[in-house]
Each structure stands twice: as structure tokens, then as C-alpha cells.
């Protein structure tokens, strides 16, 4: 089974921090060539701290995917790292969270889960399930153009708050991701087209979904 669950920063330090930071370096520095700081073949920053929670997707004791969350009222990438691009946006008060460092280890997912396993959509669904379980109102996030395309394909009915440029050629987008039952059902339907899981499994938190041999 593919298991996706949440851990605190302290729990991450005890179990998977090196794995996570190495995969983030592999994803964001090596593959996407983002301007991120790395040390000892790992990527981490000031937002990896005790105020942060992480989703970890594990299969066969191997980390496949992850995303991190910070409460929106705390320092985050919208209010600090990309403040120059989004300082004109008034973020809402209330129980919102910011998400960042969303990634799937493509080579690991292909080897362990298969080419057709909808791992990005499963992680999107897990994000909604987590957010609803913890009674957060919604999510704000900054994404690249490539991630914007993946989100559009998923069917998630998000709002683009603002488009900005970090360089002459590189655009980024501030999004509001709703976590209502309608969007949860849309993502569950996308996943169910391939995995054919039960509603109780698809809408649960933590989430545990089968890996189908014929997809590997």
C-alpha cells in the first residue's frame, strides 16, 4: 500500500529528514534547476522549522512524494521569499495554510508504482484530505507554470490570485486552493479512474491506497 501521512518537524528529524532533503535537492536543484540553497547534497531552508508540518508518501519503506505546510499567519514563502512579487496581495485572516516544496520523485514513482499510477493526483487528494481533517479553511501556494498545468489537468477548481515574474522568462502564480467537498470529490474521481478504490479509503486521513501490479 502507498501510505501518505503527516509528521511534525521534530518527527521528521527523527525519521526521514535526510531522505526528504536529498529528494528535494534532486527535484528542485538538479531537475528543475531552481535557485535553492543546498548543503551536503540536501536542500532545506528557513521554513523547515518547528512551525512546519510535512506530508510524506511512502511505499516499500521508500519516500515517493512530499509537501510541507505552514500556517499562513507565520513567515512563509508568500510573505517573505516572494514578498516583492506579492506584497500587494492582502492574505486572509483565519485558519489558512501555505503549501510549498510539493514534489514527486519521478524515477522512484515510475519504478515502484508504474507509469500509469496517478501519484500527483493522489498527493493532491491527500493535501485536501489532510486540510479538511485538520479543519483548515483552505490553502495558498506559489507554483511554477509547469505545476499550474498539472493542477489544471487534475480538475481542482483553484483560483489564480496573481501572476508574477521572478526572471524575464520565469513566471510564478499565487493560487488559492479550495478544500471543499466538491473539489475533494473531483480529485477522488480522478484517482478512482485508475485505482478503483472505495470512497472511505479515498477520503480518509491518513490515506492508504493500493499499488496495482499491472500498473508497475
UniProtKB/Swiss-Prot annotation:
Q: Which organism is it from?
A: Yersinia ruckeri
In the record, what terms sit under GO molecular function? Answer: N-acyl homoserine lactone synthase activity
Q: Which EC number(s) does the record attach to this protein?
A: 2.3.1.184
Identify the coding gene: yukI
* Enzyme class name: transferase
Domain of life here?
Bacteria
Reaction catalysed? a fatty acyl-[ACP] + S-adenosyl-L-methionine = an N-acyl-L-homoserine lactone + S-methyl-5'-thioadenosine + holo-[ACP] + H(+)
* Protein name per its UniProtKB record: Acyl-homoserine-lactone synthase
Q: Which family does it belong to?
A: Belongs to the autoinducer synthase family.
Keyword S-adenosyl-L-methionine among UniProt keywords: yes
Per the record, a Pfam family?
Autoind_synth
State the PANTHER family in the record: ACYL-HOMOSERINE-LACTONE SYNTHASE, ISOVALERYL-HOMOSERINE LACTONE SYNTHASE
Amino acid at each position: 500500500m502507498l501510505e501518505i501521512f503527516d509528521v511534525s518537524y521534530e518527527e521528521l528529524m527523527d525519521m526521514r529528514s535526510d531522505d526528504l532533503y536529498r529528494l528535494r535537492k534532486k527535484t528542485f536543484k538538479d531537475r528543475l534547476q531552481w535557485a535553492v540553497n543546498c548543503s551536503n547534497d540536501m536542500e532545506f531552508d528557513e521554513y523547515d522549522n518547528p512551525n512546519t508540518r510535512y506530508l510524506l508518501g511512502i511505499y516499500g519503506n521508500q519516500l515517493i512524494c512530499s509537501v510541507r505546510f505552514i500556517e499562513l499567519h507565520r513567515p512563509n514563502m508568500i510573505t517573505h521569499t516572494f514578498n516583492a512579487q506579492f506584497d500587494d496581495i492582502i492574505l486572509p485572516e483565519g485558519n489558512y495554510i501555505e503549501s510549498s516544496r510539493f514534489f514527486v520523485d519521478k524515477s522512484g514513482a515510475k519504478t515502484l508504482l508504474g507509469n500509469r499510477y496517478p501519484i500527483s493526483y493522489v498527493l493532491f487528494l491527500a493535501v485536501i484530505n489532510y486540510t479538511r481533517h485538520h479543519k483548515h479553511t483552505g490553502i495558498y501556494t506559489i507554483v511554477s507554470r509547469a505545476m499550474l498545468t498539472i493542477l489544471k489537468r487534475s480538475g481542482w477548481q483553484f483560483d489564480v490570485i496573481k501572476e508574477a515574474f521572478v526572471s524575464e522568462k520565469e513566471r510564478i502564480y499565487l493560487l488559492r486552493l479550495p478544500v471543499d467537498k466538491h473539489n475533494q470529490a473531483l480529485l477522488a474521481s480522478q484517482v478512482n479512474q485508475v485505482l478503483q478504490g472505495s470512497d472511505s479509503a479515498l477520503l480518509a486521513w491518513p490515506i492508504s491506497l493500493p499499488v496495482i501490479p499491472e500498473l508497475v
